[in-house]
């Protein structure tokens, strides 16, 4: 485990004390309508950053009409600053760098939380080729964003970054993964435009790159050269016209030209092989790491729920940082267990009889009971 607990200096000169990262975890803990921090969110954050080098907070909304989760935090306007400042303080008090993930859901936005706004995405719902049964299949009522709205969204991401700077965060992570707005613009399945924002790979890439450039400009204007800017992406989509490994590698070629501090690949399985494009029979993350070629550090994540899997990922040589989500949901003291070599004490299940320890908001407990794949399973025979 020596690798995991060695320091790393990012391209902007900021040293991260170790290679362990808490992945962004949706907690449904902020106020449903205002995004203000609540006691439920405070309890969830308490203790989970201990021993980690960096903690990436849950997806945080940059503009009204893009909320994909009830209880999603906000970074929209100055009234959000008190809650943002408190979140940063909570993480800093535990000794980790605090990074805010900035997000817009596009067509995945919840219809009952649009705040009177239209649901917008790259294209009208009827033009998309994403299957209705897809995980992000909630396209009903979506219309194509206008040019003015696109420019407004770019500004919203930059403004959210400025709010994060003012709130005392160490950085932001631009959420370009998991089927949300930035990925929707890059995917040929959801972006059917024929203007400057779509039609070819290069034009589909324009919006996510414009968002990144605007965030980097916000950092420059702030004078905070030590402010971390990262970008999260998903490597493939399973449906026709969706993203392939070739698309992802082309995006990486452009991202690594920018003044980024890290890239973060979102995977369900760290060791999964490429399905569409790229080198057959070669792990996605390995292909991505080779393409980056040392120009920017990579965070790897995906199914690392046991000490053995975390150790295997750490020694693979395919990522400079290792992120965990489900493992730290089940083990608040995960970093300590790893550092002390107590791998056999890492829990992979949630004990519903010990709710106070986990600090989950009520809705998260409700989802736990449904056995959803993105959450640690409940301990068998223990459910009350």
Predicted regions and their residues:
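Flavin-dependent oxidoreductase catalytic cores
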Residues: 1-384
């Amino acid at each position: 485990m020596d690798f995991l607990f060695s320091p790393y200096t990012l391209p902007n000169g900021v040293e991260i004390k170790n290679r362990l990262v808490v992945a962004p975890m949706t907690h449904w803990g902020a106020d449903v309508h205002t995004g203000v921090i609540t006691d439920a969110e405070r309890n969830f954050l308490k203790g989970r950053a201990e021993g980690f080098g960096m903690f990436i907070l849950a997806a945080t909304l940059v503009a009204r009409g893009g909320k994909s989760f009830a209880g999603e935090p906000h970074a929209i306007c100055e009234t959000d600053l008190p809650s943002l400042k408190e979140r940063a303080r909570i993480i800093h008090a535990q000794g980790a760098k605090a990074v805010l993930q900035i997000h817009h859901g596009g067509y995945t936005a919840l219809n009952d939380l649009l705040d009177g706004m239209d649901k917008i995405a790259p294209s009208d719902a009827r033009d998309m080729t994403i299957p209705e049964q897809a995980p992000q299949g909630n396209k009903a009522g979506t219309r194509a964003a206008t040019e003015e709205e696109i420019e407004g969204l770019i500004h919203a991401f930059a403004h959210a970054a400025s709010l994060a700077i003012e709130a005392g965060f160490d950085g932001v992570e631009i959420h370009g993964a998991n089927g949300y707005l930035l990925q929707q613009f890059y995917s040929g399945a959801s972006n059917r435009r024929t203007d400057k924002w779509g039609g070819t790979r290069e034009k589909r890439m324009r919006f996510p790159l414009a968002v990144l450039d605007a965030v980097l400009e916000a950092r420059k204007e702030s004078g905070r050269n030590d402010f971390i800017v990262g970008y999260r992406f998903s490597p493939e989509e399973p449906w026709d016209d969706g993203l392939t490994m070739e698309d992802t590698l082309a995006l990486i070629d452009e991202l690594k030209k920018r003044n980024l501090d890290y890239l973060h690949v979102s995977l369900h399985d760290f060791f999964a092989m490429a399905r569409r494009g790229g080198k057959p029979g070669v792990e996605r993350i390995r292909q991505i790491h080779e393409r980056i070629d040392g120009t920017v550090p990579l965070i790897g994540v995906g199914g690392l729920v046991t000490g053995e899997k975390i150790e295997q990922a750490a020694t693979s040589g395919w990522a400079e940082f290792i992120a965990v989500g489900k493992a730290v949901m089940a083990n608040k003291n995960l970093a300590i267990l790893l550092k002390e070599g107590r791998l056999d004490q890492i829990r992979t299940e949630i004990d519903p009889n010990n709710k106070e320890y986990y600090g989950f908001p009520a809705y998260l407990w409700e989802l736990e009971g449904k056995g959803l794949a993105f959450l640690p399973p409940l301990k068998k025979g223990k459910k009350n």
